[in-house]
């Protein structure tokens, strides 16, 4: 990995990226309301389960395949798989989340003129656009490798989930850092699993997450949009 590639992926994984990630908990707040999360240990277990049982089977391998599609500029597969992923979201909130963040990242890529004109035109044609599709575009525009791209995406997801737990449980800063440290190995394992997953084995089935997310839509008191 070059220094430039590292800096690009640190940029994409940064919580300062203006795509609104901080406003979503992806079901964590609903899990707290359902008493599935009570403290730092249960928060760590919930985030670990989301990483290994959901992200590693669905979002991460999907990201890897979309990265390959951008690299070869396979416009038909890009559009078809992007539409499939958006349709696979388990609730209205989760669908709006990936669409809003995907749109924001796509707008950022266009404004910064990342990628060549032909690929930018393809990016603009995808509406709605899922976050992993836009993230894959940004990585491909800088020639980032698949393993590092997936690691950056997974770390950003873990960091955002941890930040949501800090606010919602609530937890202290040290507890949050312990969660991130504890999940380093799980991130590596999730990336390796995702890279070994063929396109026809990508699986976004997550019934518990879907039910909790649907409940969150009518939850009485909420900090987050999902």
UniProtKB/Swiss-Prot annotation:
Q: Name one GO molecular function term.
A: nickel cation binding
Instruction: Provide the primary localization.
Output: cytoplasm
**Localisation:** Cytoplasm
Q: Which family does it belong to?
A: Belongs to the UreF family.
UniProt cross-references to InterPro entries, sorted A to Z: UreF, UreF_sf
> Looking at the UniProt record for this protein, which Gene Ontology cellular component terms does it annotate, in alphabetical order?
cytoplasm
Q: Subunit composition?
A: UreD, UreF and UreG form a complex that acts as a GTP-hydrolysis-dependent molecular chaperone, activating the urease apoprotein by helping to assemble the nickel containing metallocenter of UreC. The UreE protein probably delivers the nickel.
Keyword annotations: Chaperone, Cytoplasm, Nickel insertion
Q: What does this protein do?
A: Required for maturation of urease via the functional incorporation of the urease nickel metallocenter.
Any Pfam family from its record, for instance, is: UreF
User: Would you tell me the protein name for this molecule?
Assistant: Urease accessory protein UreF
